[in-house]
C-alpha cells in the first residue's frame, strides 16, 4: 500500500478506476480530481459509502483542484473527451492533447516524484505529451494500452475455444489503435500453441476483432466508450507497481533503441515494479511481426508530429 494514488478525470473510466483502487486497498487515500464541480465529490462520497459493505479502508475523496493530490505516488490520467461513433482515436488528438498538457503541468508542480499511467486517447501520443510537459524520466511515464488490448485478445480466444481466460497466454504490442500487433508466435493455451488449436481463418477474425475491440463497444453504447476493462487494465498496472510485483505486462513505453525504434511511445513488454518501468523485455519476433511493429510505430509518429506543446 502507498499513501496516495490520484485519478485525474471522474468520468466512467476514472470513477471505475478509483473504485477498484480503493477496493484493492492499494493506497491509503484515493483522490479523484475533475474540472466538473460536484462530480468527483459526489462519486467519491458514493464510493466511500460502499466501504463498509465491500470491506475496504482506503479513503476516497473528490476535488476540483490539485492541492489534495499533492505528493501522490501514482497518478492515473483518464481526463479527456471520449470517443463517439465514427470517431477514431486520432480524431481526439487536438482536444485531449490540450487537456493532458494542462493536467501534466499541475502534476509537475504538485507531485514531482509521481509515476504516471496515461489512459487518455490517443494513448501513445498522450503519453508523449505527459512526459514532455512534466520532464519525468521514461521510468515514470507509462501508457495503458497493451494490457487492455491483450485482455480483449485473450477473451476472444477463450470464447472461441470455450476455455478459461486464465489459460490463455498472449501479448499484444504496438500502438493502441488499428495497427496494434497481436503476437501469434507467443499465443498459447496452457502452453499449447494457438495455431494447433484454431484454423488460421478463425484466428485472423479474432485478430481483426481485437484491433477494432474499442470501436465495437462504442458502436453498441452510442454515447460513450469502454470503461470496465480499461479501468481493470490501469489498476493491474498500479497493483504491479505498488506491490513491486515485477510483472511483465505490455505497456506503452518510451523507446530508446529497443526493437530498433527510438523517440516514441509504443506497446512493448515491460517489467513493472516499485520504481515504475524497471526494464523493457526484447523478445524475438517473426519477420512479419517485426514489419508490423515498424508499421505501427510509423502510425504513432505521424500524430506525434502534429502535437503543439
Where are these regions (language model features)?
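Extreme N-terminal starter segment of soluble prokaryotic enzymes
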Residues: 2-5
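C-terminal substrate-binding/catalytic lobe of Rossmann-fold NAD(P)-dependent dehydrogenases
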Residues: 134-140, 149-309
Amino acid at each position: 500500500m502507498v499513501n496516495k494514488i490520484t485519478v485525474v478525470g471522474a468520468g466512467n473510466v476514472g470513477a471505475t478506476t478509483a473504485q477498484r483502487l480503493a477496493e484493492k486497498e492499494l493506497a491509503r487515500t484515493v483522490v479523484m480530481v475533475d474540472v466538473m464541480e460536484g462530480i468527483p465529490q459526489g462519486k467519491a462520497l458514493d464510493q466511500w459509502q460502499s466501504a463498509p459493505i465491500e470491506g475496504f479502508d482506503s479513503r476516497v475523496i473528490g476535488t476540483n483542484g490539485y492541492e489534495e493530490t499533492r505528493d501522490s505516488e501514482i497518478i492515473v490520467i483518464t481526463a479527456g473527451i471520449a470517443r463517439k461513433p465514427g470517431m477514431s482515436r486520432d480524431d481526439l488528438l487536438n482536444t485531449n492533447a490540450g487537456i493532458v498538457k494542462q493536467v501534466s503541468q499541475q502534476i509537475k508542480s504538485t507531485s514531482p516524484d509521481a509515476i504516471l499511467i496515461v489512459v487518455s486517447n490517443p494513448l501513445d501520443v498522450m503519453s508523449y505529451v505527459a512526459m514532455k510537459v512534466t520532464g519525468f524520466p521514461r521510468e515514470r511515464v507509462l501508457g495503458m494500452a497493451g494490457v487492455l488490448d491483450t485482455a480483449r485478445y485473450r477473451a476472444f480466444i477463450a470464447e472461441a475455444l470455450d476455455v478459461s481466460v486464465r489459460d490463455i497466454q498472449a501479448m499484444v504490442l504496438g500502438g493502441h489503435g488499428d495497427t496494434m500487433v497481436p503476437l501469434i508466435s507467443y499465443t498459447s493455451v496452457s502452453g499449447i500453441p494457438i495455431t494447433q488449436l484454431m484454423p488460421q481463418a478463425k484466428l485472423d477474425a479474432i485478430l481483426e476483432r481485437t484491433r477494432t475491440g474499442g470501436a465495437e463497444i462504442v458502436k453498441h453504447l452510442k454515447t460513450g466508450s469502454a470503461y470496465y476493462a480499461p479501468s481493470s487494465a490501469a489498476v493491474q498496472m498500479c497493483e504491479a507497481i505498488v506491490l513491486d510485483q515485477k510483472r511483465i505486462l505490455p505497456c506503452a513505453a518510451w523507446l530508446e533503441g529497443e526493437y530498433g525504434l527510438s523517440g516514441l511511445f509504443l506497446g512493448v513488454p515491460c517489467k513493472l515494479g516499485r520504481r515504475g518501468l524497471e526494464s523493457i523485455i526484447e523478445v524475438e519476433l517473426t519477420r512479419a511481426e517485426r514489419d508490423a511493429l515498424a508499421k505501427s510505430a510509423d502510425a504513432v509518429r505521424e500524430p506525434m508530429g502534429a502535437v503543439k506543446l
